[in-house]
Amino acid sequence: MPEGNGTVALAFSGGLDTTVCVSLLKEEYGYDEVIGVTVDVGQPDYEFEEAEETAEALGVEQHVVDATEEFADLCMEAVKANADYQGYPLGTALARPVIAKAILSVAEDEGCSAVAHGCTGKGNDQLRFESVWRDSDLDVIAPVRELGLTREWENEYAAEKGLPVEGGDGGRYSIDTNLWSRSIEGSELEDPSTIPADDIYKWTDNPSDKDAELVEVEFEDGVPVAVDGEELGGVELIEQLNKQAGAHGIGRTDMMEDRMLGLKVRENYEHPAATVLLTAHEALEGLVLTQEERQFKAQVDQEWSQKAYQGLVDAPLTGALEAFIDDTNERVTGTVTVKLEGGHCRPVSRESDYAVYSESAASFNEEDVSGGITQQDATGVAKYHGFQSRLANKILDDAKKGAAVTDGSGDHAASEDTEE
């Protein structure tokens, strides 16, 4: 452990974990001053109010950093990569490196000797924060992990010290909210057999009798730039689609998530805008990319998603993957209309000047295909298609028949026929 006698910048939410960390960083680690850093990546206003009230009650200097634009930019990179992990669009994972960088910047500006977080030793966030911080010369402190703290111990400690812990973590669930997603975990949801109550959802209404709605999303170079003809910045565009699609109950995920440390956890997510944008983007790619590009890009997208899940968005491999993603997305320019209905989002129309599509070639009402190719020219292809499989199956059948003769089963059958 460091000797202290300096200043430490703490990732500060005002919840139980970080409130307890403020006290422990002074008592157990010997730091003279703790600076609380709260980073805005699209959380609701009440979270900032609670963090401010808690910081004031603790006598902690608080810094609030607006990183919504940076986070929205990273979300757009995720759209270009069709990014998801086991069916969830990486909202929490994408936010952590953005938050970590903002905290590190404040720590360096304020002359801190260390940075700290309140993550447990069981989750992913400790790794995502520290992958950014350990690239600096500052000490990294993780009190909850290093001291083996439990929620029960933290509550008892907070009561003993008279720490203000009414806000933040006071509810039944652990909730994390940003522009791209809202996650809900803990309490009875830790039992995979428990059916979640409807009241855990805040962004998405129950998909019921609401009339279907068509939404048009316009892309330039793979990045969504307008909704229903209205040009919007990244933050505003995501916020609008969260409301618009959330009203139709779109973007709910209930999953068993495999964390980086090997633990399985039950997670519930809400991500209306992410669902719409990823669906629309993939539909447009299907129109403008060749078959080979789509097949290979699916592998690249999956690898990018893995690096993003790990919080390694600045890794050299991630940059190399993005070079391919950016190159293919230069043609992902056009408009996709999606239908929002009953909790589902599906593309119903797509247009682009870069469409790798010929209506006349694909039409059942036209004789010729294109470039002098006719339907009859497919006969040779049809004869060869599956030839290797047919040949392999024939050789296998012949080998089985030969084996039957060798082991005597074939001769026995023949003698029986003769006797009859």
Swiss-Prot record:
GO cellular component, one term: cytoplasm
Entry EC no(s): 6.3.4.5
Keywords from the UniProt entry: Amino-acid biosynthesis, Arginine biosynthesis, ATP-binding, Cytoplasm, Ligase, Nucleotide-binding
Gene3D superfamilies xref list: Argininosuccinate synthetase, chain A, domain 2, HUPs
Region (Disordered): 401-420
GO molecular function annotations of the record: argininosuccinate synthase activity; ATP binding
Sites where the protein binds L-citrulline: Y88, N124, R128, S174, S183, E257, Y269
Segments of skewed composition (Basic and acidic residues): 409-420
UniProt keyword Cytoplasm, yes or no: yes
Keyword Amino-acid biosynthesis set for record: yes
Enzyme class of the recorded protein, top EC level: ligase
Subcellular location: Cytoplasm
An individual GO BP term: urea cycle
PROSITE patterns: ARGININOSUCCIN_SYN_1 (PS00564), ARGININOSUCCIN_SYN_2 (PS00565)
Catalytic activity: L-citrulline + L-aspartate + ATP = 2-(N(omega)-L-arginino)succinate + AMP + diphosphate + H(+)
Transmembrane annotation, as ranges: none
Protein residues bound to L-aspartate: T120, N124, D125
Pathway recorded for this protein: Amino-acid biosynthesis; L-arginine biosynthesis; L-arginine from L-ornithine and carbamoyl phosphate: step 2/3
Family designation: Belongs to the argininosuccinate synthase family. Type 1 subfamily.
Oligomer status and interactors: Homotetramer.
The protein's name: Argininosuccinate synthase
Organism: Haloarcula marismortui (strain ATCC 43049 / DSM 3752 / JCM 8966 / VKM B-1809) (Halobacterium marismortui)
Taxonomic lineage from the root: Archaea, Methanobacteriati, Methanobacteriota, Stenosarchaea group, Halobacteria
This protein's encoding gene: argG
